[in-house]
From Swiss-Prot:
This is Phosphoglycolate phosphatase. Belongs to the archaeal SPP-like hydrolase family. Substrate binds at residue 163. The lineage of its organism: Archaea, Thermoproteota, Thermoprotei, Desulfurococcales, Desulfurococcaceae. The keyword Hydrolase applies. It comes from Staphylothermus marinus (strain ATCC 43588 / DSM 3639 / JCM 9404 / F1).
Amino acid sequence: MIRLAAFDIDGTLTINRSSTVLCLEAIDALRKLEKNGVIVVLVSSNALPVVVGLKKYIGLSGPAIGETGALIYYGEEEIVATTKYSAKQAYLDVLEKYNEYVYGSWQNMFRLHDYALKIRKQYLSKDNEIYSLIKEYVENKYPYIKVGYSGYAIHLTPKDTGKGKALKQIMEKHGIRREETMGVGDSIMDWEFIKETKIKVAVANADPELRRKADIVTTKPSGYGVVEIVEKILDKPP
């Protein structure tokens, strides 16, 4: 029986991978999981206030992971950092050096550890080239920082943290075994937490690499794939 289910947000709970519009059917599915006693965890690279705000307004009561795993929200009186480092210096450096290609996410003023860069519209067709350029520059100059690309933003994150580390801490705190968990995502960046779960799920339109690694690939994309896997879990628990 699944006791904890972890979900990425952008591209997973949205209507598709190029939109930030939530799939309302997916939100209903998450609520249904909670009503059936499953702890629902939102896992995101968004700033923590965004993740917590979303969690509260859609009616979830479980923990929330923000900043690519650097911060965990358990409640108003318990917010835990999983790293002592910050990528801010590297972020400011990249912003100055590669300003032609990228700009800072508006969420960065609400971040402490993980920082995000958005690719300018005129360069979106070269997103992977720009990502590779920045990744090589940052990881060579700042050995304590790793660089990832979600398809929405380029993230600079302390190497000693991640979505998987944060999810494992939550599992330990709640006394939940790997065999009792499920992880769902759309980006290869999500593999970091999905690999820590028993049932590893990629939505139909996920990155090819994530689809290859996952145990289950839904037949429907993004939020509609979430509805599909939740219905399967509740109807016939693995």
